[in-house]
Curated annotation (Swiss-Prot):
Domain of life assignment: Eukaryota
Record PROSITE patterns: FBOX
Organism: Arabidopsis thaliana (Mouse-ear cress)
Official protein name in the record: F-box protein At1g67130
InterPro entries xref list: F-box-assoc_dom_typ3, F-box-assoc_interact_dom, F-box-like_dom_sf, F-box_dom
Length: 454
């Protein structure tokens, strides 16, 4: 039996099942094996199988910034229920992003396998500001010149129905802009929204195809609103929320596919029903045998798992490096030591900032090598100084760049204390929106869960 007959004797479903267990980089290479394999790997059946398998085993994605250099790792998320109060897991290296000269860290977000870096200066030559869309699982990224004015912040949204990624840039006094990734005619498009509601500085969050962000009412300073942007239909909606409630928010979160607000407050009362004037308060006190909470760590909130576990991690690299999972329903805390992250370098000695993203899944969305430019509305920009062979027009340049692993970075500054720090788990309060249907802004109700750590 020759090789071709052996392959033909294997059922296609079995071949796809085997291939779906491979890393994304390997699948990308296997497209070149033959036309048959390329067709199989590009089929909707294989894409669905791969995404479902990846979603059933989500990982923790870690981005470590050392000077201007980013390194990306991932590690398994623990299964629930916990058999132990502490675990050790190994991290896998994905890529190193060496072309970044400087990055404003407040503009970093994650959506379905992609990382969005809003304000970045690329390479050592020049000072050209770009946005970067990075895919750690394949080692690829886009460098995109932003619209002008570039806006106070932007975010990456994902349309789960149309399977499209879009970048939204929000401005205070000008139109907003949006860019759809992967289309044949990539360009920034201006979109209209009410100038009455202006976005605040907090980063948006995308939940089920809707980007949420905190805004304020320019006509009534006592009114605070949450903006809702439908990624698929590119429409804005706004609903009012209690001023004192929004004032204590500094992070919008995804809590079991519902919008949540994460403040650093000791406790909070929440209005459940406006007509009945009904308030509620929920408190969770950690068991006294969880001694890990007494360790003096600078921790930051990084997200919530699909099971409702609240995840906190060290803000800066040090050895050992811990991530904590708190389950408010079971009142349990799990500490996970992540090993193998940058241990071959001086990664732990220079206060490198660590960004952690929960529920990381691999997908087969590929950047197109043939697309090298997009258009920017009504402006001209100088070309970036990125060292790559590609065409650009007078408006904007989009590039597909492979990561470089050999660039050395020696200048490292110590960052200031981030306001998203929780020392000793002093307090954690979670606000959850029960109804996240943006079409009915008058029907929102909130509940509260306050975790007090001893």
């Amino acid at each position: 039996m020759n090789r071709g007959e052996t392959l033909d004797s294997i059922p296609t479903d079995l071949i796809l099942d085997i291939l779906s267990r491979l890393p994304t980089k390997s699948i990308a290479r296997f497209h070149c094996v033959s036309k048959l394999w390329s067709s199989m790997l590009a089929s909707q059946d294989f894409t669905r199988l791969f995404v479902n398998r990846s979603s059933s085993n989500p990982r923790l994605l870690l981005g470590i910034v050392r000077g201007g250099e980013w390194s990306f790792y991932s590690s398994p998320q623990p299964k629930n229920p916990y058999e132990k109060s502490s675990l050790e897991v190994a991290a896998d290296f994905h890529m190193k992003l060496s072309e970044i000269k400087q990055h404003q860290h407040h503009g970093t977000s994650y959506a379905f396998g992609l990382i969005y870096l809003r304000t970045v200066w690329m390479s050592k030559e020049g000072n050209y500001e770009v946005c970067v869309i990075c895919k750690p699982s394949t080692g690829q990224y886009y460098a995109i010149l932003p619209p002008q004015p570039s806006g106070i912040f932007g975010d990456l949204g994902f349309d789960p129905i149309g399977k499209q990624f879009k970048v939204l840039v929000l401005n205070i006094l000008d139109n907003h802009y949006i860019l759809t990734l992967g289309t044949e005619n990539d360009k920034w498009r201006s979109i209209q929204s009410s100038l009455r509601y202006r976005p605040c500085g907090q980063s948006p969050i995308c939940i089920n195809g809707v980007l949420y962000y905190i805004a304020y009412d320019t006509q009534d300073s006592s009114n605070d609103v949450i903006g809702c942007f439908d990624v698929r239909f590119e429409k804005f909606k706004f609903f009012h929320v209690n001023h004192d409630m929004v004032k204590c928010f500094f992070e919008l979160i995804n809590y079991k596919d519902k919008l949540g607000g994460f403040p650093l407050e000791l406790s909070m009362w929440v209005l459940e029903d406006l007509e009945k004037e009904e308030w509620s308060k929920y408190a969770y006190t950690l068991k006294p045998d969880n001694n890990v909470v007494k360790v003096n760590y600078n921790l930051s909130f990084v997200g919530v798992t699909t099971r409702g576990e609240i995840v906190l991690a060290k803000m800066y690299a040090c050895k050992p490096f811990y991530v904590f999972y708190y389950n408010p329903e079971n009142n349990t805390l799990l500490s996970v030591e992540i090993q193998g992250v940058g241990e071959d370098s001086e990664w732990f000695s220079n206060y490198q900032r660590v960004y952690v993203f929960v529920e990381h899944v691999k997908d087969l969305h590929q950047f197109d090598n043939t697309k090298t430019s997009i258009n920017l509305p009504e402006q001209k920009r100088k070309p970036t100084s990125i060292s790559i062979s590609s065409k650009y027009d007078d408006h904007v340049r989009t590039t597909l760049i492979s990561s470089r692993k050999n660039q050395q970075v020696t200048t490292v500054s110590r960052p200031q204390q981030d306001r998203r720090t929780t020392n000793k788990f002093s307090a954690l309060c979670l606000l959850v929106m029960k109804n996240s249907q943006v079409s009915k802004p008058d029907c929102f109700s909130w509940s509260s869960a306050t975790m007090l750590y001893l």
